[in-house]
Amino acid sequence: MELLLLSNSTLPGKAWLEHALPLIAEQLQGRRSAVFIPFAGVTQTWDDYTEKTAAVLAPLGVSVTGIHSVVDPVAAIENAEIVIVGGGNTFQLLKQCRERGLLAPITDVVKRGALYIGWSAGANLACPTIRTTNDMPIVDPQGFDALNLFPLQINPHFTNALPEGHKGETREQRIRELLVVAPELTIIGLPEGNWITVSKGHATLGGPNTTYVFKAGEEAVPLEAGHRF
């Protein structure tokens, strides 16, 4: 399988998806026809989200079709060379994909060789479940099971920093809560600016920041770019 799982879409001082474009270009390998899954977008319309994505990827020669705009979305996915899943609210994303019967077709086409690109919520959707999202559960997705294209859980936008005076839990504390009730999980705290690529049977960490792996009963393990999972 070919996957590009990004923690986030925007970095300080850079345009939207700018940091991801070289990574996308490297993994295209001749693929040009993409379907875009905009359902995580809540405060922007799906048309606007699709148009923004299409404009950014046009210089790479990628043609983007919003899956919400086609008559037969399952057929569109089955014929896609690239599946792009945008960030936003992960619960809304999973709910829409489940209700429209898109989870199995996405999994199948990626396993057959389509490239999967997802940022933030889109990276969460590639995991076995969405239980490591940071998002508010604004809708009920009727279960947390997701695509299971990547075997570990990703927590995008990972940071352990707290604002001065803030008394809420750190991100690691939230992750540790999940590991109490699901100790079988391995969770990757993927900070902004980092990504995971899956290509030719290998999953590789990229990006300038330290990533952390969390397991039940163990200290967090720091990982740097180039680490293979």
UniProtKB/Swiss-Prot annotation:
InterPro entries: Class_I_gatase-like, Peptidase_S51, Peptidase_S51_dipeptidase-E. Pfam families: Peptidase_S51. Its EC number is 3.4.13.21. GO terms for cellular component: cytoplasm. Gene3D superfamilies: 3.40.50.880. Disulfide bonds: none annotated. Its main location: cytoplasm. It is found in: Cytoplasm. It is an enzyme of class 3 (hydrolase). Coiled coil: none annotated. One of its GO terms (biological process) is proteolysis. Keywords: Cytoplasm, Dipeptidase, Hydrolase, Protease, Serine protease. The active site is at residues 120, 135, 157. It catalyses: Dipeptidase E catalyzes the hydrolysis of dipeptides Asp-|-Xaa. It does not act on peptides with N-terminal Glu, Asn or Gln, nor does it cleave isoaspartyl peptides. GO terms for molecular function: dipeptidase activity; serine-type peptidase activity. Hydrolyzes dipeptides containing N-terminal aspartate residues. May play a role in allowing the cell to use peptide aspartate to spare carbon otherwise required for the synthesis of the aspartate family of amino acids. PANTHER family: ALPHA-ASPARTYL DIPEPTIDASE, PROTEASE S51 ALPHA-ASPARTYL DIPEPTIDASE. Belongs to the peptidase S51 family. This is Peptidase E. It comes from Shigella flexneri.
